[in-house]
Amino acid sequence: MLNSRSVGSTGSNNTPLGRRRFDEKPDSLPPLPDANGMSNGYRDSYKSNSRMDHRPDGYHDGRGRRAYRKHYWGHPTPIEEMLPSQMELETAVKSCMTMEQLELYSLNVRLEEITQKLRTGDVVPHHRERSPSPPPQYDNHGRRLNTREIRYKKKLEDERHRIIERAMKMVPGFRAPSDYRRPAKTQEKVYVPVKDYPEINFIGLLIGPRGHTLKDMEAKSGAKIAIRGKGSVKEGKGRSDPSVRGNMEEDLHCLVTADSEDKINHAIKLIDNVIQTAASVPEGQNDLKRNQLRQLATLNGTLRDDENQVCQNCGNVGHRRFDCPERINHTMNIVCRHCGSIGHIARDCPVRDQQPPMADSTADREYQSLMQELGGGSAISNGNGEPQKSIEFSESGAASPQAGHPPPWAAASTSVSSSTSSPAPWAKPASSAAPSNPAPWQQPAAPQSAPALSMNPSSLPPWQQPTQQSAVQPSNLVPSQNAPFIPGTSAPLPPTTFAPPGVPLPPIPGAPGMPNLNMSQPPMVPPGMALPPGMPAPFPGYPAVPAMPGIPGATAPPGAPGSYNTSESSNLNAPPGVSMPNGYSNR
C-alpha cells in the first residue's frame, strides 16, 4: 500500500531511496502519471529533456543523464554539438607509429578542433555542467572583462599557443594555422599559499633585501615577475592605478610574463622552490633567509664577519661561544680572585702564599721608566748602580721584604725601609728644595733685565768702539748724509742723529747695542772717495787723496803715487782678554 504522501500533483519522486540505491534490478513499478496525465518514462522528471526522448538507449543512463564521448586531449565534447567538419576528423590510428608520431598526430587533431571553434565562434559549451561564473569585472568604460565568451575564447587561444609552441620544437618545419597570431608576451599566474601558512612572510622572501632576490630570479629566468593580489600593496597605495585596483580582488599570486614558454616555466620553478623551502624548512635553518639577512647587513654596512671568529669554548673557527655545538667548558669560566688567572679557584691558587705578580707588569715598568726620566734619574739603575727591580714581586719568587705591608699606592707618605731599592716615583714625598741637577726643562728661566751700558768705551766690543780721529772743526762738516757701515769701525748712527755744525748730538735712549755717548761727527766721505772741489779735508792729519788725471772727482787706485791704504792705517786690534769675531784677526 502506497503512502498518501507519495501521491500528489507535483510529480515528486515516490520511489524509496534505499531501494534505488541498493537494488540493482530496475524498478518494477509502472511510472506515475504527471499532473497533465502524461508520462515521460523517467522517474526524475525534473531532469528530463525533450531531446533525450529521441536518443538511442546507448547515450543515456537510467537516471536520465546525458552521455558524452570521452576524448584524449581535453574536456568532453557532446556528439550532437560536433560540426560535420569535426565528425570527419580521423581519430583512429590504423598503422604502426612511434611515440613521437602519435604525440604529434594528437596535437594536430586538437589544433584543428580549436581552430575550427575559434573560426565559427562556437567557444561556449552548451551543457549545463560547467563551473560557476566568477564575479564580474569592468574596465574604466564600464565594459565587462570576464564574460563567458571572453573567458572561454582566451582559454582556447592559450591552449592553441601551447600546442603550436610544442609542435614547433618537435618539427622544425611546422606551419601554424593562417589565422594564428603569436602573442607578444605570455602570462602565467603562480598563487602563493598565504591561507595555508599565514605566519610565513612569502612576500619578503620573494622580494628579498631591496628587491635583490626578485631581480636575481628575473635575471636567471629571463621573465618578468610581479606580485599581485591581496596583500601585495600597502593600504592606501595603488588605488589610483586601475591595473592594481583590478588585481586586488584576487588572491596573492606572482604574475610571470615572458615571450616564450621556457622562460615562464623556469621562473615558475624558481618561485615554487622559494615557496616550498619556506613552507617546509624552519626559519632558523633556511639558507635563503640567512643569506638575505647577510646581504641586508652588507648593504647597511653593519655586517660582522663571524667566519673568522675563534670560539672561546672549543677553539674552532666559524662560530661564537654562545653558538658552540660542543659541550660548555665550565673550567674556562672560573677566574681566580687571588691571581686573576683562569681555570682554578682561589683555594687552589699556586701563588696563594706569595705575593702575586701584577698582570700588567710590563706597563708598570714602562710607567716607572717614564717617571724616572721625567724626574732626571736613570730608568735602568737605582742609586747604587744596580738594575731597578719591581717593587711588587721579586724575581726569586719569595716574599719581598715588604710582604704583608700595604701596597705602595696605599702608603704614599711612609718611607721605604729598604736601602737597596728606591721608592716608586708616586711614593716620593714632595720636597721644597730644588734638585741638585734639574732637567733642562725644570731649570728656572733667567730674569729679563735690560743690559747695563758701560760708559767706558774700552769695555765695548771692537766693532762698537769709536774710531780715533782728530778734532773735527765745525767748519769742516758737510751736510748730513747716510754713512755706509765699514767693518772694523763703529756702527753707523741713524740718519736723524746727525746734527748741524757746532751742535752736539743728543743722547739716544734705548738704542740697541749703542752707549749713550756724545760721539763726534764721523767722517762724511768714505775712504777712497775724493771731496768736491773747494771742500776742505775732514782729516787734516792725513794727506788728501790725489785725483786721477783726466777724470774730475775720481781718486787714484790703491798703490798709485799719492794714495794710501786704509786697511793699514786702521787699528783693528782687540782689547786685552777679548777675542776677535769670526773673519777678523789681530794685526
From Swiss-Prot:
Annotated Polar residues bias: 1-16, 379-399, 465-483, 563-573
Positions with biased composition (Basic and acidic residues): 44-64
Stretches the record annotates as Disordered: 1-64, 121-142, 375-490, 551-587
Zn finger (CCHC-type) start-end: 309-326, 334-351
Record domain KH: where: 191-271
Modified residue annotations for Phosphoserine: 131, 133
Stretches of the chain forming a coiled coil according to its record: none
Gene3D superfamilies documented for this protein: 6.10.140.1790, K Homology domain, type 1, Zinc finger, CCHC-type
Biased composition (Low complexity): 410-454
One CC-aspect GO term: commitment complex
Source superkingdom: Eukaryota
Keyword Metal-binding attributed: yes
Gene Ontology terms describing biological process: mRNA branch site recognition; mRNA cis splicing, via spliceosome; regulation of mRNA splicing, via spliceosome
Localization in the cell: Cytoplasm; Nucleus
GO terms, molecular function: mRNA binding; RNA binding; zinc ion binding
Cited SMART domains: KH, ZnF_C2HC
Keyword terms: Cytoplasm, Metal-binding, mRNA processing, mRNA splicing, Nucleus, Phosphoprotein, Repeat, RNA-binding, Spliceosome, Zinc, Zinc-finger
InterPro entries from the UniProt entry: BBP-like, KH_1_KHDC4/BBP-like, KH_dom, KH_dom_type_1_sf, SF1-HH, SF1-HH_sf, Znf_CCHC, Znf_CCHC_sf
Subunit: U2AF large subunit (u2af59), U2AF small subunit (u2af23) and bpb1 interact to form a complex required for complex A formation.
Protein's job: Necessary for the splicing of pre-mRNA. The BPB1(SF1)-u2af59-u2af23 complex has a role in the recognition of the branch site (5'-UACUAAC-3'), the pyrimidine tract and the 3'-splice site at the 3'-end of introns.
Family: Belongs to the BBP/SF1 family.
Protein name (database record): Branchpoint-bridging protein
Gene (UniProt): bpb1
